[in-house]
From Swiss-Prot:
Chemical reaction(s) catalysed: uridine(1939) in 23S rRNA + S-adenosyl-L-methionine = 5-methyluridine(1939) in 23S rRNA + S-adenosyl-L-homocysteine + H(+)
The protein's role, per its UniProt record: Catalyzes the formation of 5-methyl-uridine at position 1939 (m5U1939) in 23S rRNA.
Protein name, as recorded: 23S rRNA (uracil(1939)-C(5))-methyltransferase RlmD
Similarity comment: family membership: Belongs to the class I-like SAM-binding methyltransferase superfamily. RNA M5U methyltransferase family. RlmD subfamily.
Binding, [4Fe-4S] cluster: C80, C86, C89, C168
Residues involved in S-adenosyl-L-methionine binding: Q276, F305, N310, E326, D353, D374
Amino acid sequence: MARTRNRFDRTPFQTAITDLSHDGRGVARRDGEGGKVTFISGALPGELVRAEPTARSRHFDEAKTVEVLEASPQRVAPRCPHFGVCAGCVLQHLEESQQIVAKQRVLMDNLERIGHVTPQAVLPGLTGDNWGYRRKGRFSVRRVEKKAKTLVGFRELDPRFVADLSVCYTVIPQIGEKIPLLAALVEGMDGKRDIPQIEFIAGDDAVALTIRHMQPLSARDQQAWIAFAQEHGFAIFLQPGGVDSVHPLWPQEVPLSFRLPQWDVDLAFRPLDFIQVNASLNQKMIVHALALLDAKPDDRVLDLFCGLGNFTLPLARVVREVVGVEGDAGLVARAKDNAQRNGLDNAQFYAADLTQDQRNAAWMRQGFDKLLLDPPRSGALEVLQQLPLKTFERIVYVSCHPGSLARDAGYLVNEQGFTLVSAGAMDMFPHTAHVESIAVFERR
């Protein structure tokens, strides 16, 4: 929707906050605007604030908090000095125990409003580490000529700009405390204008940086990266083109993996592979999902969008057989290798685009007792519409977007005759508005 950012009244106004939006902003209705909704960054429910308008559109306005006149008892001082500028976190001003409560409300609202479903039970919110948890991410890199400096960080709330970060407390300390050193390193390079992003990922025994560069790195710049890696304990990968162009600069062999000790499983991965961001929450989530699935020794389980085998391989320790299906052929290859490395011969993997017709696929014709799925933000409706759903006793759906979960839940309950037994939020990304969730469906 087009927004008007040119000529409108930016005079600060006083208003009461009634709710929290799905993206972590306070919600107000201005009587002088005919009850028009205004989304106000930095505001919490129950507060009285003075806010400055920042954008207007036909159906809603946007503003930012300039003064809190009456604070919520749930308000806390943000730990990060960049809060309110950096878009990496938007909920640091909300007490930690209340963040999962807010996310539960977002989930339930989506289920009722979009899916027209209500769970029989609300699962307790699942939480893990709140600080230093982010083991995978991507920093934007930008040379600002007017300031004669290089910025490394996440985007600002205004996504046109890169936040000038001195630290990030949600990123693992090995990375979050070294952001200024990264910026200074790039600033001193010959190709400082040719590096648009730096990705980071951490295993249990190594931390890797992948440098996206638009032009070949000079020998001097390559040596600078190697020296930085040796001093700070990083592995460096270079990415001159697409994903397939990623290759190690130093060292040549990097043991990237993470362990799931409860199931005696070790998952190896590559520097741009998808892994769950929050290691402690991931382990709790797997325990939670397998318990909700009620996996039994004689079960055959289908695991869709299986990735590296994050759920598949723990399931293989519990059930008779598990089949994992994933759209990324590289991840499937790694999942097969992981199964072999862990001595699991009861896990099969298939590469398949789950947004396309799979009704004649070999894995689709196999019989299964239960289904676990962990789709991307777009959800799983296309594949759900093809599955022989009535053969599954139970479905556990792990979601990274409450809207697509709600849509798919509506399909399962209102069109396919399943019962939504329970659902609940999981705080994979503390201090952000991101809502991870899990839902359980049973055949009626």
